[in-house]
């Protein structure tokens, strides 16, 4: 992580060009891994150099929340932290273990509940297809069950795309991991969205999704499901797979 002096130097430059900035996003992997004290130091600098700032956010892992108490999270919220993007990926324990994520469904529920208690708005990422062939239904059901006990502002749905430089690619080649077929992924997404019973927003328009979808739940739930039903019925596996192999970067 950058030393505090470097952060302050960057903020001096930002103040020159955007003195009335209202939204700030801390970049570089998952900055929320920083300690509470360092995050508070940065928040104080943000307030000093960007007095018009209304909120700041960053990427986070589920495990980044664990060392921080609800009281500390409330203090960060008071300093205008209000947008965490959390790479949940799934709440299906066998898949989390298979991918060495370092947490389980119970951890997701415990840690994100702390954000709810602190009043911090957050988004989660659901990685469609992560479990591989035959695991989509279980992943969708388990993930919806956990999220129905939480209050994510946005659920970003992206689809696993394995590139040659990824370690998982070697597992695909040697047969120890089999990618979920494309139609099965659409069925997984349908199950996931159909089981969500909370007020939230769905963003499934990432380049990794051959069938882009967006909407607000519960109002748009039926419309989204109809779109998925049409895609499942009319789009052949070969066409969907062709889209996947043409994706060169995320």
Question: What residues fall within each predicted segment?
Answer:
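Canonical Radical SAM [4Fe-4S] cluster-binding loop centered on the CxxxCxxC motif
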Residues: 1-9
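Hydrophobic anchor at the start of a short beta-strand
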Residues: 56, 122, 200
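Conserved strand-turn element in the central/C-terminal portion of the radical SAM core barrel
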Residues: 63, 91-95, 115-139, 158-164, ...
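Conserved SAM/AdoMet-binding glycine-rich loop
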Residues: 16-117
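Catalytic cores of alpha/beta
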Residues: 68-73, 131-149
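Conserved, mostly hydrophobic/aromatic
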Residues: 26, 58, 86, 124, ...
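Aromatic/hydrophobic pocket-lining residues that form the small-molecule binding cavity
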Residues: 7, 39, 69, 108-109, ...
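Auxiliary Fe-S-binding modules of radical SAM enzymes
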Residues: 148-250
């Amino acid at each position: 992580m950058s030393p505090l002096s470097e952060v302050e130097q960057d903020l001096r430059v930002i103040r020159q060009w955007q003195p009335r900035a209202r939204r700030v996003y801390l970049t570089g992997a998952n900055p929320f891994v920083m300690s509470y004290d360092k995050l508070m130091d940065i928040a104080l600098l943000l307030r000093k150099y960007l007095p018009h700032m209304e909120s700041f956010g960053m990427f986070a892992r589920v495990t980044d929340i664990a060392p921080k108490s609800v009281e500390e999270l409330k203090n960060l919220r008071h300093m205008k932290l209000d947008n965490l993007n959390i790479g949940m990926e799934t709440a299906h324990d066998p898949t989390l273990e298979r991918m060495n994520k370092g947490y389980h469904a119970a951890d997701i529920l415990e840690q994100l509940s702390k954000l709810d208690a602190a009043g911090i708005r957050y988004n989660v990422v659901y990685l469609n297809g992560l479990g591989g062939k035959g695991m989509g239904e279980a992943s969708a059901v388990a993930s919806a069950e956990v999220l129905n006990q939480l209050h994510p502002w946005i659920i970003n749905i992206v689809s696993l795309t394995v590139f040659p430089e990824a370690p998982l690619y070697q597992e695909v080649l040697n047969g120890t991991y089999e990618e979920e077929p494309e139609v099965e992924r659409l069925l997984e997404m349908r199950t996931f969205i159909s089981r969500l019973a909370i007020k939230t927003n769905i963003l499934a328009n990432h380049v990794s999704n051959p069938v882009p979808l967006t909407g607000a739940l519960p109002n748009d739930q039926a419309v989204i499901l109809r779109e998925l039903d049409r895609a499942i019925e009319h789009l052949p596996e070969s066409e969907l797979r062709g889209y996947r192999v043409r994706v060169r970067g995320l």
